[in-house]
Structures are given as C-alpha cells and as structure tokens.
Amino acid sequence: RGCIPSKTLLHIAKVLEETESLKNMGVGFSKPKIDIDGVRSWKSKIVTQLSSGISQMAKARKVQTVQGEATFLSNSEIQIKSESKKQVVTFDHCIIAAGSSSSTIPGIPTENKDVLTSRTALDLVRVPKNLLIIGGGYIGLEMGTVFNSLGSVVSVAEFLPNLLPGADADLVKPLARKLKKQFEEIYLSTKITSVNPSKPKGLTVTMEKDGKTSTKKFDQVLVAVGRKPNTKNIGLENTTIIINDRGFITVDKCQKTNVDNVYAIGDIAGDPMLAHKATHEGKVAAEVICGLPAEFDAKAIPAVIFTDPEIAWVGITEAEAKEKSIPYQKGEFPWAASGKSLAMGRNEGRTKIIFDPDTKRTIGVGIVGPNAGDLISEGALAIEMGADAEDISLTIHPHPTLGETFANAAEVFEGTVTDLYIPKKPG
C-alpha cells in the first residue's frame, strides 16, 4: 500500500530527473510526455504482481488465508467479517500485524477530496497544478519528489526549523539545496492553522510563522505528518493486551505481548515504523511460537529516504551522539573525490562512518547521494559484525563504484586515504 507503489513512482521521478541532467553531458531529449493513466496502471501492475506472488507462496506452504475485517472477541478468539458472512476463529497463538495509518491534523477536513493522505495521493486520481505538502519528513519529501516530476508546482510546510528532523544536518543539506530549486516554496518553522475550501475550487491555507499569519491558495493539500498505529477498531478492548501511552502494543524481545499467546509485530508494535524491521520481527515471532530460541536483537536498523539524492543512515547518528554525550570519532569521504560519482554528474554526496574512539568499531553510518539506500547495507553489516575501521579499509572494494566510498571513509579515519590529501595531524 505504501512502500512499493511509492518507490515505483519515485523510480519514474528519478529517471525523468536523470534524463534532464544529461543535457550537461551533451545529450538532449524532447520534453517527455506523461500519461498519468499509464503511470497509474504500471504502479498497480507492480503491486498486483507482488500481492499475487505472496498469495501463491502462502498457498504453496499450505497457509490458509481468509479475507475480511478481524476484531478480537477475547484473548483467544477473533471474529472475521467478510462481505458474505461472519465467522469466529479460536486460536492457540496470534500475531497482530495491523500496521499503521496516516496521522491527521485537527481542523483539517480530511473528508475533502482535495485533502490527500500519503495513501490517497498514491492513487494518482489527478496531478494538481499546485500542491502544498504539510510535513517535511520522509513521506512528505518523497511524495513531493513524485508530484514535482509529474508536473505539479510543489510547496512544503514544516512545523520544525529543519527538513527531516532526526537526520544529521550535513546529510540533509545536499537534498535541501536541490529541493529549494525544484520546489516553489519550503516553509520552515511554519504552523498550518486552517485549510478551507475555495471558490470555485481549490483550498485556502492559513499559515502562521513568527507570530505572523498569511494565506495561500492551492489546488490540493497533502497531509504527511507521520503515522499512527492501528490499535483502534480491532477489538483490543475485549482483551487484556496492554497498549502504551503512544498507542503502540507493548511487546518483549520475543515480540510477545503481556498475553502469552498473542504477539505483535511491525508499526503497531513501536518505532521505527519500517517494513524491514516488521519482517524481522515477524520471523522472530514465528520462530518463538514454533519453540525455537529467538528474540529481536538487532543492533542496527537502516533508515532510507528515497528522494533524489537519497539519504540513508544506520546505527547512531552524529546528532544522537552529541545529544546523548556518546564519545565518537568519524571518517568522512566527499563524493566530489569519487570517480564514479563524477562520471554520473553527481558530486553532492558523502559517506560518513562513526566509530567508537576506544575500540575503533563502527557504531553508525550515514550516506547521502544516489543509491544511498542500496549502499547502507554494508554499514548495517559492519555494525552487526563489530567491524572496526581497519576491517573496512583493508577490504578491497571494486573501482570505480559508489560502494568504495565506504572504504574511503574508513581510510580517512585511519589516515591511509590516497584519494584525498589530508594533512597529517601534528604529533
């Protein structure tokens, strides 16, 4: 519903951007023609293909599937309501994987067809002439990238002083610089106080910044202010399952709730709300139910922002280390010194590795640049395996690739890098 359709559209956006950038390399194309019906059809085809594949794998493994709306009746029973009937299922064990849904802002009429959520925006009913995105987090910026590439004039309003709160500022900077060129406006430290229908069409948005109020008109508004766990409307009040003050189901390292035979995984079980974390948790829960020794003990969970450039990080961020007074040292390699990135016409990236100053082991990695999401896995492996700077720098990486910037960053830390001139520290 979210990951695959959005990444399908982001791929289209990336190709369109790369096509445009080829002008700097002596290659030009006529203006691309965007068939929105064709784009929508392609996106739906990919989703259907993957969904049917999952159904076939379940059938091959003799997993019975029942389509319907499930609600708990007790700690050991659920009711499944489908179009034709209701049935009660008694279970020995249950795994709750109900996910999350888009958060809303009080006073913004989400029932208005021109007020979109990340889910309804992916339906691509139409491409608005101008679009305001409320929220400068990963969902808002990814959707802004998509709609900008499809022809919308995009603006973003973020309540906090910076885009992508939580990410290291040095990683966000290259993306912010590019988005300022692509987007019409980026309103920071801005509160949206109201969204009202305009005549004859569109929406009038009232904004507040530094105590001053202004109004702007947009064809559509996309609310992207985070997600909330789907713990309501599934009958949890009929059980003794504990929900914390943020609405998440409380689980232990085995993904078990306070009810011995009920487990919870994914967005409904707590942050970070990431599909790959949910998959890992699901495997843990399944193994525990089967009597195997398993628990969720991941030292590193990668996060990726699929904008252009992409941003990815894993482990401790530099901002987190500073905030929590965690001692660290780092090695950074600018992609302006990477032959592969220069050949691609993309020199804005950087790879950063954060090390424990005593053991020299990797405790965090941050990357910004094309394909950062594909590159971050090496960082996750380095953290999980306890790799130190020497382990990474002495591992031969293929040349010319973006992946070798990971080794280069470790070499910078070690003082052995040859792709950059860094004066030796005195003493």
Locate predicted features.
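Glycine-rich Rossmann-fold phosphate-binding loop(s) that bind the pyrophosphate
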Residues: 134-137, 167, 267
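Glycine-rich dinucleotide-binding loop and its adjacent helix/turn
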Residues: 3, 96-157, 182-186, 237-239, ...
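Glycine-rich flavin
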Residues: 1-127, 160-164, 170-173, 178-187, ...
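FAD-site-proximal beta/loop scaffold in flavoenzymes
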Residues: 111-128, 215-289, 374, 382
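A Rossmann-like FAD-binding core segment of flavoenzymes
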Residues: 30, 64-67, 71-84, 89, ...
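Flexible, glycine-rich terminal cap/loop adjacent to redox cofactors
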Residues: 1-4, 8-18, 290, 306-317, ...
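Active-site substrate-recognition segment that forms the wall
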Residues: 139-160, 177, 181, 256-263, ...
